[in-house]
């Protein structure tokens, strides 16, 4: 809570090489926050940018001390950067936004209004995504459907990481301390009073995406994490497939016996054997792969490495870097 007893909103931006966007982002966020009676802080988490992004932030900090900067020691990715921002936020509520201005700052007032109505988590749902190609939208829609089918919680379709989270809900999320958290799923998992706000997502303001849909591994990892974080269904798939293959094998065996005994079918042992071997081999590899994903998550957790390492901080009461 700020010293003037106003409620405080913490806005968190993770970024990588966004020199073409940051100034416009700051201008629009400041304008939006001037329309509400709240104090605020702007936490920019720098994922080891190599362009002029940091210089732009430092220049803006000279006139606006609400701007705070966290510099990572190397590139850790979006999720660790957001977690770092969450842990450093002092606001009564936090909002994480993409730094590319695809999430328009102008709808912050709508999120705040829902928060004022008593909601602890305010999701944003994209009704339209400008600048996105049909293939990406189609694959994304299918991925959401699959995750929804196997997940133990309801993850809203077309809802990303852009959402408002109250201090109460945020503390619950941070207590989980998962090694590879799915940030768009955890707010739904912790519960509390939740709602959603619809908006049209803009095209990127400038520059190119740092997460190309086809060449980047991030979308695939997010999809796998979306399934494994809130569901054990994949572990049972091998059981169900094993049953189906066994049942199918029995039916096929009976079919072969009938064909040979009553219709004089020629010897097909080798072809039948090869089909059975290939099918069972594929199922075994599939089952091992699924279990490997879960074991890999356990292995990663047992390493007990920090999720991120901070090189330096500016604007915080405690500017030491031992928090990770």
Language-model-detected regions and their locations in the chain:
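Structured catalytic core of nucleotide-sugar glycosyltransferases
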Residues: 1-133
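Conserved amphipathic alpha-helical interaction elements at protein-protein interfaces in regulatory
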Residues: 31, 35, 59, 63, ...
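Hydrophobic helical membrane-anchoring modules
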Residues: 2-6, 185-324
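Acceptor/aglycone-binding surface of glycosyltransferases and processive sugar-polymer synthases
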Residues: 66, 70-74, 78-88, 102-181, ...
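A ubiquitous structural signal for well-ordered alpha-helices
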Residues: 25, 32, 56, 111, ...
